[in-house]
C-alpha cells in the first residue's frame, strides 16, 4: 500500500518529467522550424540570379553547418548528460574532416 507521502513524491516526480518533456518538445519544434527556415533561405539564395556563386556556395555550406548543429543537439539529444563519449568521437571526426578539406584546398589552390 502506498502512503500519502510517497504518493505525493511520485506525483511531483511525474509533474517534473512532464514539464521536462514539454520543454524538450518545445525546443525540438522550434529547431525544426528554424531548419525549415534555413532550407528556404538556401533555396532562395540559389534561385536568386543576382547573387554570384562565390557567395552562394559558402553561404549554403554555412547554413548546412548550422543545420547539422541543430540536428545533433536537439534531435540526436547530444545536449543531454551521458553523451560525452559519442560527442568526443563526433567532434574528433569533424576535426579530421576539417583538416582533410583544408589540406585538399591548400594542395589544389597553392
UniProtKB/Swiss-Prot annotation:
Recorded topology in the membrane: Multi-pass membrane protein
The alphabetical list of record keywords is: Cell membrane, Membrane, Translocase, Transmembrane, Transmembrane helix
Q: What is its EC number?
A: 7.1.1.9
Q: Does the keyword Membrane apply?
A: yes
Q: List where the protein spans the membrane.
A: 27-47, 50-70, 88-108
Q: Which domain of life is it from?
A: Bacteria
| Compartment annotation | Cell membrane
Keyword ATP-binding listed: no
A GO MF annotation of the entry reads: cytochrome-c oxidase activity
Q: Which GO terms describe its cellular component?
A: plasma membrane
Where would you say this protein principally sits, based on its record?
membrane
Q: What is catalysed by this protein?
A: 4 Fe(II)-[cytochrome c] + O2 + 8 H(+)(in) = 4 Fe(III)-[cytochrome c] + 2 H2O + 4 H(+)(out)
Q: What family name appears in the similarity comment? A: Belongs to the cytochrome c oxidase bacterial subunit 4 family.
What name does the UniProt record give this protein? Cytochrome c oxidase subunit 4B
Identify the species of origin. Bacillus subtilis (strain 168)
Taxonomic lineage is: Bacteria, Bacillati, Bacillota, Bacilli, Bacillales
- Its encoding gene is what? ctaF
Amino acid at each position: 500500500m502506498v502512503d500519502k507521502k510517497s504518493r505525493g513524491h511520485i506525483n511531483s516526480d511525474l509533474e517534473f518529467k512532464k514539464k521536462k518533456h514539454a520543454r524538450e518538445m518545445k525546443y525540438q519544434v522550434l529547431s525544426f522550424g528554424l531548419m525549415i527556415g534555413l532550407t528556404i533561405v538556401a533555396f532562395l539564395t540559389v534561385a536568386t540570379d543576382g547573387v554570384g556563386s562565390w557567395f552562394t556556395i559558402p553561404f549554403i555550406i554555412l547554413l548546412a553547418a548550422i543545420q547539422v548543429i541543430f540536428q545533433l543537439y536537439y534531435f540526436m539529444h547530444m545536449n543531454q548528460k551521458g553523451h560525452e563519449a559519442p560527442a568526443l568521437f563526433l567532434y574528433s571526426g569533424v576535426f579530421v574532416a576539417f583538416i582533410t578539406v583544408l589540406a585538399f584546398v591548400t594542395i589544389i589552390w597553392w
